[in-house]
Amino acid sequence: MINKENRYFYNALSNIQNQNYEKAIEDLIKVIELDEKNLDAYYNLARVYYDIKSYNKALKTYNKSIEIYPYDSEIYYNRAEVYIELNKFEEALKDLEKAISINKSFSDAYYLISVIFRKQKKYKKSIKYLKKVLETNGEDYIAYYDIYKLYNILIKHEKDETKKEKYLNIANKSLKKSANLGYEKAISRLK
């Protein structure tokens, strides 16, 4: 026999899948009322708030998740996404660094740091973190493509012809690697 808490929780998951977010929120709040330390309920509730762009509620709910269990790198990563939507980049960077301190090979966290630096037009720092993505996942063709794009931006702003040539060389190698990896992924999906 399934208990009340689980019934609400599984109903919430079904409602999330069907994009019936208001009902999912109601069900998740009921789960939390029955068990105020249910990390999965808080996590899913925060995700729903994020998906419906209710960022302040998402932030509050992620804060509660961290209070319950401060050792989950995903929660810090997800809270960083909320901070980015709120243009609170410093807070997002702190959360991403925390996520990485918990999980050193969290390539998505390195990638999101590169996104923040790109938004701030700190292109060399962005490239630095894309290279960290590739250290943890050398098959990430999107990271190679982003490196290509960022070096092309640097080329436009660089006066030194030697550096321009170096940047162009790196950009072209990155584009080629991205294309090759993307092609391989596409072929493997067709099989």
Each predicted region: which residue ranges?
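Canonical positions in the second alpha-helix
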Residues: 30-31, 64-65, 98-99, 132-133, ...
